[in-house]
């Protein structure tokens, strides 16, 4: 069965502030607000992480970096936590802060050509803080499990002295 697409990358960027080359979610295929979300990321040999490799690299060097696998799943988790409260601009509104992650297990390598299927479940939400869990699959096989991931959605004004964020055009003032 093929999952229908709920949101493409352009819609994803309306919910979270990530942009290329840091946006690591291509599609949201299912979302039940406050409960669960499924998202996809296609891993390509054109990813920036492979830019330094030559044409004759051993397969082990083509493994998708585990930190990017976690980041991609984490972006899907933030999408679930923030779905009803989009934050596409980190200079205003709220910012998504990763607080903790535990019980991460990598079960098999991911290589270019793989399509990651992130499954995220809301374990608990308290105010603007969410605890999430889930896994990533490739071809129906689990490649990574996340026991708990904590994300906090905080007003930018609470995090920046004076409550304003530089746009980069004012010399940092």
Predicted features and spans:
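HotDog/MaoC-like acyl-thioester-processing domains
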Residues: 2-5, 110-173
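Hydrophobic beta-strand-centered segment that forms part of the acyl-chain substrate-binding groove
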Residues: 3-6, 77-117, 144-146, 151
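Short aromatic-glycine motifs in intrinsically disordered, low-complexity regions
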Residues: 7-19
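Short N-terminal amphipathic alpha-helix/helix-capping patch enriched in small hydrophobics
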Residues: 8, 21-24, 69
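Catalytic strand-loop segment that frames the active site of acyl-thioester-processing enzymes
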Residues: 20-64
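Conserved positions in beta-strands of structured domains
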Residues: 26-29, 102, 107, 121-123, ...
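Compact, glycine-rich, soluble single-domain proteins
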Residues: 54-80, 98
